[in-house]
Amino acid sequence: GVVIHYVGNPGTTARANRNYFESLSAGTDEVYASSHFIVGPEGEVIACVPLTEVAYASNSRNDDTVSIEVCHPDETGEFSQVTYDRAVELTAWLCEEFHLDPEEDVIRHYDVTGKLCPLYYVEHPEAWDAFLQDVAAAQEAL
């Protein structure tokens, strides 16, 4: 499956979030966090962890999911249009690549742990439903 996250630190870049994850690999803290992909504020996508490896992002679902972190401009956690569009494209590509059904196999971090992530799409379930519909349409277009 695919798990969608938000970075939780408004206004930051994909590179800054990647660098944060990379700094954790030094192992000086007891913090383990990573993601397969980060979608940045300009729609850029940074691949952080190979798809053949586990990213530490979704607790009990780390072993069977691909994680996507999405940057957001403000405290609401709503993705900008460019990041939304790129997250839809990336998620659709992953669904096609791994023969996944967006309605069943794309989930929020919240759906695994109860954490309010991605915040806007937990607080606005209709926006989450629209995201899944957009992913399904994008997958069909591939």
Name what the model sees in each region.
Residues 1-100:
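Active-site-adjacent loop/helix surface patches within enzyme catalytic domains
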Residues 73-142:
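Basic/polar, cationic surfaces and motifs that engage anionic cell-wall
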